[in-house]
From Swiss-Prot:
Reactions accelerated catalytically: uridine(38/39/40) in tRNA = pseudouridine(38/39/40) in tRNA
Protein name as catalogued: tRNA pseudouridine synthase A
Active-site annotation: 51
EC number(s) given by UniProt: 5.4.99.12
Gene Ontology biological process: tRNA pseudouridine synthesis
GO molecular function ontology, one term from the record: tRNA pseudouridine(38-40) synthase activity
Chain's role: Formation of pseudouridine at positions 38, 39 and 40 in the anticodon stem and loop of transfer RNAs.
A Pfam family recorded for this sequence: PseudoU_synth_1
Record lineage: Bacteria, Pseudomonadati, Pseudomonadota, Gammaproteobacteria, Chromatiales
Record's subunit section: Homodimer.
Binding, substrate: 109
Family as reported in the entry's similarity comment: Belongs to the tRNA pseudouridine synthase TruA family.
Species in which this protein is naturally found: Nitrosococcus oceani (strain ATCC 19707 / BCRC 17464 / JCM 30415 / NCIMB 11848 / C-107)
Length: 259
């Protein structure tokens, strides 16, 4: 049978999602916990592979198993075997047509910036701190150039393995609440480092280093070298993955906040 899971994790102390020898990863941690519940080896497929230090409030995975367990047994049993930084939120049997990655129709990320003079303590490694003033007005103006279907070569990592750099950004919003600046972005899919590179460009514009139209110039250049610095992973969260309604999967009631 095929089981879908929703989970959240604090990525601060993980070397990313994907299993790698000799380092702690979210995938390996989850597979070890689920294997203990299933009494057999379990391999999970994820909706999106997050980088080292990146967090998730609503990651989705699936796995195949010959072991029958009630839904709450996968949740409680899995969580009993997981590290505190990872939690299974829900479990649901799905038909074999469901695929956590390929069935997804949209992914939503949130990038959180603490924009104040003093560094964070409680939110350390869970937000990106920037001490100089940032103009949300300029960041909003710049973000509008990136909405729609474009070649995002300037925003992909050098090691990105995606066959095509074309992605469709459904929306990109920048908001401020007190000292907090939030970048919300949704697309059909994302390239490696795409959100962090977009955040880096918007922050450079917010600082006043570049005008808002620079975002369009970077996009049109189709060259990573012109795109400036990749933003830190600390403030990045995967907050939702959308699937066609007929799969009838649970959804979080609200995205992550830290205020």
């Amino acid at each position: 049978m095929r089981i879908a899971l929703g989970l959240e994790y604090d990525g601060s102390n993980f070397s990313g999602w994907q299993s790698q020898k000799g380092v702690r990863t979210v995938q390996a941690t989850l597979e070890q916990a689920l294997s203990a519940v299933a009494n057999e080896p379990v391999t999970v497929i994820t909706a999106g592979r997050t980088d080292a230090g990146v967090h998730a409030a609503a990651q989705v995975v699936h796995f195949d198993t010959a072991t029958f367990r009630l839904e709450h047994n996968w949740v409680f049993g899995g969580n009993a075997n997981l590290l505190p930084e990872v939690a299974i939120l829900w479990a649901q049997p799905v038909n074999e047509a469901f695929h956590a990655r390929f069935s997804a129709i949209a992914r939503h990320y949130r990038y959180i910036i603490l924009n104040r003079g003093a560094r964070p303590a409680i939110a350390n490694r869970r937000v990106t701190w920037y001490c100089q003033p940032l103009s949300v007005t300029k960041m909003k103006e710049a973000g509008a150039f990136l909405v729609g279907e474009h070649d995002f070569s300037s925003f992909r990592a050098k090691a990105c393995q995606a066959k095509s750099p074309v992605r469709n950004v459904h929306y990109l919003e920048v908001t401020r609440q007190g000292d907090w600046i939030v970048i919300d972005i949704s697309a059909n899919a994302f390239l490696h480092h795409m959100v962090r590179n977009i955040a880096g460009v918007l922050m450079a514009i917010g600082k006043g280093e570049q005008p808002p139209r620079w975002a369009e110039e970077v996009l049109q250049a189709r060259c990573r070298a012109v795109g400036g610095v990749t933003a830190r992973p600390d403030g990045l969260y995967l907050v939702r993955v959308d699937y066609p309604d007929h799969f009838d999967l649970p959804r979080l009631s609200r995205p992550v906040t830290v205020w």
